[in-house]
């Protein structure tokens, strides 16, 4: 009886960590959603609503989607997580081209902490630039009640503090919750806006502004995209690997056959988020500073890279392709994999171990990455054309669907991993307790 109680306590203790992580995740999302509804002092809500009605369907809609609706409320989280994402992109690019940062990255945990510290400094700088631009834009367009230094100081301080809190919250979710914190915050913002967008679509269809058949077609397209994304994200290219017969001491290991799994889309949803962030930064500057005297060309730039424009499509496609290859290269090194296979006595049939195996794996990975980049571009851009043509809210775009589906799949995979890990630990502890009990009987 005592032994069964001990086993039950061990099992419950294992699952309690998962429940604690889930509770922290939900609490963090609740805090994020509460903050998204706290407005910055000194904002005229009527003028703000009129401003967003004028800019409906522009790049601001995408910016508002990533901020979870905080931008249109001009809340303390209006900048969202984009300054941190932009700083992360810059730091990763600099790490790839700077020998000093590359060496710092190889120093282990201390080096990674140093790079994270540099990323935070970059986040402060970018958030400050965007906060100043947003505050000046609000003042020049009459959205602020009083266009004085007091408003600018309070607004800039609030925006920067909100962006830094979002960065901290995302890091805490990654460390103490489940899933990638940044992706979870973006996911929460998109999902929070979906009910409103769907309700507006049905209301527009009821009033005759949208063809009901077009709305049904968009809904079926969304279901098809979700199924397609799940199919591709679960897809793998398996490279056959053989282990030769070997002997270690007195033990003889028979020849074995295994495989090296390579995901079709190894970069996940990161390229879509990074490419969107690259477009959002200059577009946001153009939207806020474009009204100022002598800076009208910035507004022309913002209009040129608005959703549906040829330049937007070209830059977005180039960004996705670049970040697919860049992020895959950061995550997976064919030379290291080939070297590890050689050290373990494994080889790819028909391929010489070492350099030839590395070139073969790199070739397979390049083809997979190109297919993954084309798949992600199609998912993000094709629905955008149909959504714009049917005048459906931007929330139903391909980028948002891709982020939602991939984040949910990653979340479920991590929960399953925690469950399997705890079951394994429970079995091992159970075996140890049985061995201890039989020893006591002797």
UniProtKB/Swiss-Prot annotation:
The keyword Transmembrane helix applies. This is Protein translocase subunit SecY. The central subunit of the protein translocation channel SecYEG. Consists of two halves formed by TMs 1-5 and 6-10. These two domains form a lateral gate at the front which open onto the bilayer between TMs 2 and 7, and are clamped together by SecE at the back. The channel is closed by both a pore ring composed of hydrophobic SecY resides and a short helix (helix 2A) on the extracellular side of the membrane which forms a plug. The plug probably moves laterally to allow the channel to open. The ring and the pore may move independently. It is a multi-pass membrane protein. GO terms for molecular function: protein transmembrane transporter activity; signal sequence binding. HAMAP family: SecY (MF_01465). GO terms for cellular component: cell envelope Sec protein transport complex; plasma membrane. It is found in: Cell inner membrane. It comes from the Bacteria. Belongs to the SecY/SEC61-alpha family. Its main location: membrane. Component of the Sec protein translocase complex. Heterotrimer consisting of SecY, SecE and SecG subunits. The heterotrimers can form oligomers, although 1 heterotrimer is thought to be able to translocate proteins. Interacts with the ribosome. Interacts with SecDF, and other proteins may be involved. Interacts with SecA. The chain crosses the membrane at residues 24-44, 76-96, 125-145, 149-169, 178-198, 212-232, 269-289, 312-332, 363-383, 385-405. It holds the Pfam family SecY. Keywords: Cell inner membrane, Cell membrane, Membrane, Protein transport, Translocation, Transmembrane, Transmembrane helix, Transport. InterPro entries: SecY, SecY/SEC61-alpha, SecY_CS, SecY_dom_sf. One of its GO terms (biological process) is SRP-dependent cotranslational protein targeting to membrane, translocation.
